[in-house]
């Protein structure tokens, strides 16, 4: 491709609304342009990368035995009513009516559509297992689209759906897709981790997320230092401390704390170690208990894991914190002065808090705390659960090593749905005994457009993008120095361009009438992995200059050896 015939569209300045590195560089490199909030046009450079990611995904999903199909972006609303997800998805599900007042939605995912298809097309166990996928545009009406294509409203996604006669078959399909994901991300040259995950709104029995590691990642991932264990922080178990609760050494005392409305203020003003404090959080209760509110008690330096809390039978779902007005009406004190002693409401204690002694907590009186609280002596312990997020140094749930935390960008997710959708939509087949069996489903997604952004977050420097070879928009750039002033340079560049192209190599030939500095800057910005520099001086010495984008070092390569040299680099 010649730049003179190409829409390069690079920018010197970064638009003001770009926040993360990938958004800034995708705009500056001429990969995308914003049309409206969360909506982007993919320019030629960006589309080349997107298509390469798509093709790698397609090849590996094909190799896993899945079959490609294509479903409509517009879906009948009635299908979503069959599964009950019409309300669960909330406002992210964009709804509209056609001219005949029939309700439709723009597809955020396709569980309902694919299940309806299979229940009509598949009738016998002999047609199983079956795994169908598509690579298609999706739409989710994000409340706050941000970070460019990382969290856009419209995005490109690979979504696959497996159907099996039993759970053993589902597990086999799930494992095959897990392997396919790893192969795809390996080929893309990404540093990623598959991690245990919560099933979220899609539901099901088992789930893994695939995260590209990057400091800008929105998710925290917990890893074992001595095993392959990895989990999203929402899913990672905080193992119960392997100690017995120490005996009391202090008497419980009531202390005036008029200016300590937070744990930090309590620690600063009264010298109490933060690991000797607890915080009491009031949340709405479920119908399972005879109380409007239930209290959750965690250590002062720990954070409540809302996903874990929401799964407790006593807690309403979705999780909702009690308001200050509700708390005062029940307790007579505000949120900064709450604790378990004398509490007339049900409460649940975190595992770590259950082994604490001599700790401090609110006295359920404004401006007062109890110090030296001990379980059993001052208040009954009650129910103990895992309520908190893990922290670095916690024991790994696998029993090997401790946990470390890193940030990740979720680019893929796989679920064992079981019969969650197939039962609601009556999707079954006749087994070998002629009995109708509801199918076991799996669903699998890769955010193709998000992969592009995640790769940039992981591969960039001060000059621009550093693409892994497999997904770079071009493999090689030719930068001829002052070509329009030197016929010899022009002839050499044209000859090399023709030879590389004939060898099946994707080349960007910068034939613009631009200063060399501008040409070099653009090639570094868009991230072409290999650059060949042609100039009169180097040709006088019988060589071209080669520059590797990742290493940044220049190397002299004999003119007659350049094709073999480049082919070896790309092998």
Curated annotation (Swiss-Prot):
EC top class, as a word:
ligase
Q: Which reaction does it catalyse?
A: tRNA(Pro) + L-proline + ATP = L-prolyl-tRNA(Pro) + AMP + diphosphate
A Gene Ontology annotation in the biological process aspect, one of them, is: prolyl-tRNA aminoacylation
Q: Which UniProt keywords apply?
A: Aminoacyl-tRNA synthetase, ATP-binding, Cytoplasm, Ligase, Nucleotide-binding, Protein biosynthesis
Stored CDD domains: ProRS-INS (cd04334), ProRS_anticodon_short (cd00861), ProRS_core_prok (cd00779)
Domain of life, per lineage: Bacteria
One annotated GO molecular function is: proline-tRNA ligase activity
The protein's matches in InterPro entries, at most eight in alphabetical order, are given as: aa-tRNA-synt_IIb (IPR002314), aa-tRNA-synth_II (IPR006195), aa-tRNA-synth_II/BPL/LPL (IPR045864), Anticodon-bd (IPR004154), Anticodon-bd_dom_sf (IPR036621), Pro-tRNA-ligase_IIa (IPR002316), Pro-tRNA-synth_IIa_bac-type (IPR004500), Pro-tRNA-Synthase_IIa_type1 (IPR023717)
Would you name any one GO CC term? cytosol
EC number(s) on record? 6.1.1.15
Enumerate the PANTHER family for this protein: MITOCHONDRIAL RIBOSOME PROTEIN L39/PROLYL-TRNA LIGASE FAMILY MEMBER, PROLINE--TRNA LIGASE
Family in the record: Belongs to the class-II aminoacyl-tRNA synthetase family. ProS type 1 subfamily.
Q: What quaternary arrangement does the UniProt entry report?
A: Homodimer.
Q: What is known of its domains?
A: Consists of three domains: the N-terminal catalytic domain, the editing domain and the C-terminal anticodon-binding domain.
**Which HAMAP family did the record assign?**
Pro_tRNA_synth_type1
> What NCBIfam families is this protein classified in?
PRK09194.1, proS_fam_II
Could you tell me what this protein does? Catalyzes the attachment of proline to tRNA(Pro) in a two-step reaction: proline is first activated by ATP to form Pro-AMP and then transferred to the acceptor end of tRNA(Pro). As ProRS can inadvertently accommodate and process non-cognate amino acids such as alanine and cysteine, to avoid such errors it has two additional distinct editing activities against alanine. One activity is designated as 'pretransfer' editing and involves the tRNA(Pro)-independent hydrolysis of activated Ala-AMP.
Q: What name does this protein carry? A: Proline--tRNA ligase
Organism for this UniProt entry: Vibrio cholerae serotype O1 (strain ATCC 39315 / El Tor Inaba N16961)
